[in-house]
Design a protein with these regions (language model features):
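A short glycine-rich, Lys/Arg-flanked "PGG" loop and its adjoining helix->strand segment in the class I
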Residues: 158-175
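Glycine-rich helix-loop-beta junction characteristic of Rossmann-like nucleotide cofactor-binding loops
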Residues: 14, 72-79, 139-142
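Conserved class I S-adenosyl-L-methionine
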Residues: 79-89
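S-adenosyl-L-methionine
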Residues: 106-159
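A basic, amphipathic helix-loop patch mediating RNA/tRNA/ribosome contacts
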Residues: 1-48, 82-83
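Conserved SAM-binding loop of SAM-dependent methyltransferases across substrates and taxa
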Residues: 90-101
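Flexible, glycine-/basic-rich loop-and-beta segments that form/coincide
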Residues: 234-269
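Short, glycine-/aromatic-enriched active-site segment of Class I SAM-dependent methyltransferases
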Residues: 180-197
Length: 269
């Protein structure tokens, strides 16, 4: 009988979850009968030899690598801060926040039962499952957050940024993941939900940036995620800082959107 590679890894305790198994596989650390395998869904007999080589993932999911890059590139510090992880899923961003000194993380997701068991039992984590961020109000948290990450799917950031902004301190910061397939018009999204056109990537980044400025969030840094999304989409990291309402907000990005998109395609395509 044959099974998916990620399932076989879970059954053999080579990974604590399918998400973690996929992360090992996509990182090129998994070998089947001595051959490197890079597809989690490939079917193998139950008798094959599976090895995990190289560096194992430092977080409960590969999502943590995305926030890790943002923190390093954008000079974001989370030490002693209260944070939110919007679209937490298994908790890769939450894990990264805790490992970088966050004292509390509100892990918010519309789903249920996804947050890693280690994080679910961590007293610093407030697990807010079955929760749509669009309807969360300050009273639900009881305290403002210093920082929030946003990694959501099947919804535009233009529907999410304002509710998140309303939950931040006066000097709060956001790192959001821009996913072109959920920002572009349906006619611009290709097969399997993949957007490959750099011009569309530039267009959606500029749309999110301009919207952020309209709600008094200053665009400070822009880069691209070090890993692609599940279907192979290139994703982008945007760093925003909160400004008082009614004040002038300038675009402080030190690089052009076009240059970041070109670099992303050069490295990840």
């Amino acid at each position: 009988m044959k099974k998916r590679l990620d399932m076989l890894m879970m059954e053999r305790a080579l990974a604590p979850s399918r998400e973690k198994a996929k992360a090992f596989i996509m990182a090129g650390d998994v070998y089947v009968d001595g051959q490197k395998e890079d597809k989690a869904g490939t079917m193998f007999p139950e008798t094959v030899k599976i090895e995990v080589r190289g560096n194992t993932l430092p977080y409960v999911s590969r999502g943590g690598l995305k926030l890790e890059k943002a923190m390093k590139n954008f000079d974001v510090t989370l030490d002693s801060k209260i944070c939110m992880d919007v679209g937490a899923s298994t908790g890769g961003f939450t894990d990264c926040m805790l490992q970088n000194g966050a004292v509390k993380v509100y892990s918010i997701d519309v789903g249920y039962g996804q947050l890693d068991w280690k994080l679910r039992n961590d007293p610093r984590v407030v697990c807010m499952e079955k929760t749509n961020i669009r309807y969360v109000v300050p009273e639900d948290l009881g305290e403002p957050a210093d920082f929030s990450s946003i990694d959501v799917s099947f919804i535009s950031l233009t529907k999410v940024l304002l509710p998140v902004r309303n939950l931040l301190t006066d000097e709060g910061e956001i790192v959001c993941l821009i996913k072109s397939q959920f920002e572009a018009g349906r006619e611009k999204v290709g097969k399997k939900g993949v957007v490959r056109d750099p011009a569309v990537h530039q267009e959606v980044i500029e749309k999110v940036r301009d919207y952020a400025m309209s709600i008094f969030m200053e665009p400070c840094h822009l880069s691209f995620s070090p890993i692609k999304g599940p279907e192979g989409n290139i994703e982008y990291l945007l760093h925003l800082k909160k400004h008082p309402e009614g004040t002038g907000v300038t675009d402080s990005l030190k690089v052009s959107v076009e240059a970041v998109v070109a670099e992303a395609h050069g490295q990840l395509d």
